[in-house]
């Protein structure tokens, strides 16, 4: 019998990992296996395997329950807490004077637990969609329309799953509770537990004549489109939550949410690097410009700007262009662009150019042969003195 993998192991993090470390691991896996990015046949299946571990470990209550009770604690029905979180032992010893209190304890161990109202409205599942952005789109933002498949409320039956003109009926076996009593043999003897009704499968309702459109599910698969306004200054791996754009709910419950994952590609821009709101650019200049100084055009994402290079500038010298970086997501400010100077050494000199450099070296007392020779013997003298 196959055993479930440890959720921390699935995400590749330690049990003491912080929330940021868990999110970082999830983003890494999403970028690797998301079906929109990875075209391998089993990518979608691999992608699904770490959805529940992420949903569990990113929620403080669910994570605490998982750490204490393992996979049983991650079950939405464990202890009667329902999808909203962890609810403990389903009533504990509130009725310890009779069988009911002990029944609650046995149920939490042997698969029962008090079930939530099966007819209560329940929110639909969340969905995820990924958008690939160019370097410029991530910096300046983008408005786009995305289309995807989702379950919507059936237009024929209105979501109740029954043929028009008919209505679902209360389940004759569980009387609408969605669960039934059952005896189970345990190491402690025979005990009464509650389990999902095998007639209505936990819905508390029976549909005699099903809707021909949705076949009794109350949902139908449709292509849904929504406008997404990506703000300026987003970073790789960030998510946007679009409320009520996920799957349809049940029993009149609201739609789930759509989480849009943003993937920002630096490959579309080969001259800039970026870290948050800071943009980095390497400026090539020749040694004459470095020695004498110059005024040069520097490209930025906002257009070219003039930059004065002081005389005697050395390679790796940094300049900061205020307000020429990427917008910050919070507030109306903008980051800076950092410019790093890289002095380019000339290649393939002709004889006239070589002679000019030799003359320059003599005028400044920088004979290359003398420097190399003196430098070598000075090092040897220092070595023998030690």
Curated annotation (Swiss-Prot):
Ranges annotated as biased composition (Polar residues)? 364-374
Q: Which cofactor does it need?
A: Zn(2+)
Domain (J) ranges: 6-70
PROSITE patterns from the entry? DNAJ_2, ZF_CR
Where mainly located?
cytoplasm
Give the record's GO biological process terms.
chaperone cofactor-dependent protein refolding; DNA replication; protein refolding; response to heat
Q: List the PANTHER family hit by this protein, alphabetically.
A: CHAPERONE PROTEIN DNAJ (PTHR43096:SF48), DNAJ HOMOLOG 1, MITOCHONDRIAL-RELATED (PTHR43096)
Protein name according to UniProt = Chaperone protein DnaJ
């Amino acid at each position: 019998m196959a055993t479930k993998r440890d959720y921390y192991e699935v995400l590749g993090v330690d049990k003491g990992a912080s929330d940021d470390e868990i999110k970082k691991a999830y983003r890494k896996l999403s970028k690797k296996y998301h079906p929109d990015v990875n075209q391998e046949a089993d990518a979608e299946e691999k992608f699904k395997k770490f959805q529940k571990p992420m949903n569990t470990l990113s929620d403080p209550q669910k994570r605490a329950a998982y750490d204490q009770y393992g996979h049983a604690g991650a079950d939405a029905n464990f202890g009667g807490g329902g999808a909203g979180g962890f609810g403990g032992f389903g009533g504990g010893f509130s009725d310890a004077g009779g069988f009911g209190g002990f029944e609650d304890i046995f149920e939490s161990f042997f698969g029962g637990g008090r079930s939530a109202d099966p007819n209560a409205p329940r929110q639909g599942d969340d969905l995820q969609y990924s958008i690939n952005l160019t370097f410029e789109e991530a910096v300046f933002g983008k408005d786009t329309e995305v289309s995807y498949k989702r379950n919507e409320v059936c237009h024929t039956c209105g979501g109740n799953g029954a043929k028009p003109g008919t209505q679902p009926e209360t389940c004759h076996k569980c009387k609408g509770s969605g669960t039934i009593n059952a005896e189970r043999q345990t190491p402690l003897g025979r005990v009464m537990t509650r389990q999902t009704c095998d007639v209505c499968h936990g819905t508390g309702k029976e549909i005699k004549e099903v809707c021909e459109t949705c076949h009794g599910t109350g949902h139908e698969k449709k292509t849904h489109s929504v406008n997404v306004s990506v703000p300026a200054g987003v970073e790789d791996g960030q998510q946007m939550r679009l409320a009520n754009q996920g799957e349809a709910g049940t029993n009149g419950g609201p739609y789930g949410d759509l989480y849009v994952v943003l993937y920002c590609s630096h490959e579309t821009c080969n001259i800039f690097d970026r870290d948050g709101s800071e943009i980095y650019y390497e400026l090539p200049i020749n040694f004459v410009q470095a020695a004498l100084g110059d005024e040069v055009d520097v490209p930025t994402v906002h257009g070219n700007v003039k930059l004065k290079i002081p005389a005697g500038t050395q390679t790796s010298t940094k300049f900061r262009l205020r307000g020429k970086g990427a917008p910050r997501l919070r507030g109306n400010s903008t980051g800076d662009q950092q410019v790093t100077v890289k002095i380019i050494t000339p290649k393939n000199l002709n004889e006239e150019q070589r002679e000019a450099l030799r003359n320059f070296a003599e005028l400044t007392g920088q004979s290359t042969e003398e420097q190399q020779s003196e430098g070598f013997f000075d090092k040897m003298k220092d070595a023998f003195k030690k």
